[in-house]
């Protein structure tokens, strides 16, 4: 169901999240740190608990009823994920611990076979460290050149620079769909078009996008897509890597162990399972997978379009309200999604965040695992408030009031 904006059931939604009902430092909790990790609805908590109470067993390893039931439940979630991001097949979905592991899997598997010394790959200046460091490591190990697409002062990718970074030896472009600091929504269709035109593949970091907007990996025509469950109202420790079937089929395994093999012989060597199981060595986080399925059900029941409209209204309200705070500097473009980065005068982000915490307001402070982006703006850290499907206008009002109060107390 997609609710009209004026009928978005915010009170009911907030009631679904028990943690939001508490007080912090004597004040009602205003949780504005969902970009770091989102809170969990009762539907997810109850489903995971019920799985442990009544269904838990090792998957893909037993013929008994509980094992078969747990295996079936896990594979149903794989199919549910495929439907949620419009993948062609459930077998294009690999379960991992999170976005970071998904990117490392591509770097250590696809990277081992697709790159030769002298090749290059392209990332952007706004990437999370998880989409920088694995490629630096691969470049060092394989003798590659890592090229960087810069950003403009407004926090947009400088797309005019992209053609000069792409050539016949570009093997991969790795880019975020939405910046975890600036909220910039990147022009993926154009990036993918240009990359494919020179024969390069594209990996999309969807960690900050999949909870805010509909994702269609086939329409995007991306080659890899990664996201985490804990930012999508699901459990921690579970994530997803989508890969085009022909790429996954050609990739060697990264980790070895149980479940990812077809045949093991001490004399003949080992043959490997087909994807996606080839990339799922060891015992999976099956309860987390079940919880992720419940999170997808919850989001789908509300409607992604309704969530996006609700958050869009809140974002516009927040940006307009924050613009009235003296000495506050906003970072990033006007049109953004999910997050608002700012600093208050000359005050360190840590101090601002500490004061807000005393008022019951939770935000993120620091470099946000994006040190190159901090360097681009010449600051060591930023404050970041982030929105979710349970965010409300009262939380924005309290954030703005808290910042006004800090300005009065501390001055410029």
Swiss-Prot record:
Recorded superkingdom: Bacteria
Pathway: Cofactor biosynthesis; iron-sulfur cluster biosynthesis
EC number: 2.8.1.7, 4.4.1.16
Catalytic activity line of the entry: (sulfur carrier)-H + L-cysteine = (sulfur carrier)-SH + L-alanine; L-selenocysteine + AH2 = hydrogenselenide + L-alanine + A + H(+)
Protein's cellular compartments: Cytoplasm
Entry GO terms, CC: cytoplasm
One annotated GO molecular function: selenocysteine lyase activity
PROSITE patterns with a match to the protein in the record: AA_TRANSFER_CLASS_5 (PS00595)
Record InterPro entries: Aminotrans_V_dom, Aminotrans_V_PyrdxlP_BS, Cys_dSase_SufS, PyrdxlP-dep_Trfase, PyrdxlP-dep_Trfase_major, PyrdxlP-dep_Trfase_small
Predominant subcellular localization, coarse grouping: cytoplasm
Cofactor(s) it depends on: pyridoxal 5'-phosphate
Residue positions of the active site: 369 (cysteine persulfide intermediate)
Quaternary state and interactors: Homodimer. Interacts with SufE and the SufBCD complex composed of SufB, SufC and SufD. The interaction with SufE is required to mediate the direct transfer of the sulfur atom from the S-sulfanylcysteine.
Family: Belongs to the class-V pyridoxal-phosphate-dependent aminotransferase family. Csd subfamily.
Record protein name field: Cysteine desulfurase
Lineage of origin: Bacteria, Pseudomonadati, Pseudomonadota, Gammaproteobacteria, Enterobacterales
